[in-house]
């Protein structure tokens, strides 16, 4: 499901949780980059990795634990975080959460 340009949409309701899993939905993709919506069930994680560009993420439901260069940050619904390019980062879900990045 893609979002309609020029329309208001509810990001949190565009994706469901999968029991014991992570779900991703690419909402937009072009030469400048992409926008992806994720849902993480409790206990799930994304292992440490880097990206060659800054990444802005916003939690749209729940809260996540985001480790950036070894520092753990708790990011809650409505809050955002910019991950600097090249920074080692990982994600974990103590509770279910949804984010857009």
Describe the role of every protein-language-model region.
Residues 20-21, 36-51:
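Conserved short histidine dyad/triad with adjacent acidic residue
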Residues 60-61, 76-77, 95:
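A cytosolic small-molecule/anion-sensing beta-strand core signal
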Residues 85-101:
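Ligand-binding loop in jelly-roll beta-barrel domains
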Residues 70-85:
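Short acidic-glycine-tyrosine-enriched beta hairpin
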Residues 39-41, 51-66:
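Short, conserved beta-strand element in jelly-roll/cupin
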Residues 1-32, 67:
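A short, N-terminal "cap"/entry segment at the start of jelly-roll beta-barrel domains
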